[in-house]
Amino acid sequence: MKRHCLTPLFIVISMIVLILAPLSAQGMKEQPSEQRVVSLSPNVTETIYALGGENLLVGRSDYCNYPAEAETLPSVGTLYNPSLEMILSLEPTHVISSAFVPDELLAAVEQAKIAVLSISAQETFEGTYDLIRAVGDVIQRQSQAEQLIGEMKSKVQAIETKAATLPKVTVYMAFDFGSFDSAATGDTFLHEMIEKAGGKNVAEDGQYWTYSKELLIEKDPQLILLSPRWGASEEETIREFKTTKPYSDLKATVKGFDADIVSRQGPRSAEALQIIFDLIDGER
């Protein structure tokens, strides 16, 4: 299957933009009997499928790669520069956008009397549920959204309960390294996930997804979780990290993770928490 991955830096930028905008009043039309939705955000596409609304989707972005059948939908382009012409050609009633899409493009969509919802990553883990509810409201799947949220909360609670009985492991979750060191700092939802999974986030004192090499070396965590770099495999990224100064001085175990699952807030966030728990648990 063709895979569309975001660069670590692009993932970080996407997480910094923390916006949950309501449906735009401009260009709104009455709720149609048949919705046609274009999703410009991967986690939104995943959520629509999880809520059983896949039949409403008529278009997606290049990065909407899960579930696999989503890739059969027409793509309107990238997250940050979708084609207005392509969007309009699909005759959608609703466009659900990420915060990357230029305001002028969304304004043009609204001028075509198409409803626009701009939605992006949330600052807290709890915000994941808000995102699911927002999408459920748009596609009239409110009860399905609440059911999904209930199932996710049960899974999260089970993981937290188990993690609470186990020793903590010091963890550093990295999205980039080298000239720019990016990590899950204390002001991020991934910090919450590390803590829920039984880890002690050594980058808790950092902000805005950035951390210093000096502090990382000083903290010397037990486990480093590393997102694969653009165009590189998990193994290649880990090898580069381990052989690059000053990271090569660290004694930590280094493990990779699938950023598509872990960094996308949506229906797979409980699964992502289980992944983080399992990675941490292997170091106890």
Go through the PLM ranges and name each one.
Residues 41, 99-100, 121, 206-208, ...:
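Short secondary-structure boundary segments
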Residues 35-48, 143-197:
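Basic- and aromatic-lined ligand-binding clefts that recognize polyanionic substrates
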Residues 35-36, 127-137, 146, 157, ...:
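Structured C-terminal subdomain patch of bacterial secreted/periplasmic proteins
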Residues 84-91, 111-112, 212-223:
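Short helices/loops that flank or line small-molecule/ion binding pockets
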Residues 66, 101, 105-134:
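Flexible loop/hinge segments that line or gate small-molecule binding clefts
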Residues 36-101, 105, 202-205:
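A short, structured surface patch at a secondary-structure boundary
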Residues 61, 186-209, 255-256:
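His/Asp/Glu-enriched short active-site or ligand-binding loop at hydrolase and phosphoryl-transfer sites
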